[in-house]
Amino acid sequence: MKEKLYIAYGSNLDQRQMARRCPTAEVVCSGMLYGHELLFRGSQFGAVATVEPKPGACVPVLVWKIRPSDERALDLYEGYPHLYRKENLSVTMDSGERDVMAYVMTGEREYGVPARSYYETIARGYADAGFDTGVLNEAVQESVRRMLNEVAPEEELNGTWQMTL
């Protein structure tokens, strides 16, 4: 039974949800994913979390130890390989830096707003882990800004309105 490490940055931060989905998974520690930002993509309404490279940004994560049965359950939940792909990302933990498996959204899907229940699940995970929810709230705001820019690019608006979040 080969175990591996997996990082959660979205709804899988919620330990109650993970206990139901992956009963043998265990939290190892928290960490930081430097050089990435949290965003919401997939649809304008009901978007889901992903991380994308961005110099200077960082995303708090939980590092989980998972077994093959947990990984199969995560594959189903994450829509692997169609919605998410598996990627090894460099995570900084107290014990140092290490490449850890993460699910990262495939393709260029549209930006959007997460469903309230999905957002609340992530917020609960942030609170339980002691993470600053400012990162989560900034991710929602940035995703909304990008969604609106996709619908009506700022240069086409000629300054006729200004969005403030």
Q: What does each model-found stretch correspond to?
A:
Residues 1-165:
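Glycine-aromatic micro-motifs
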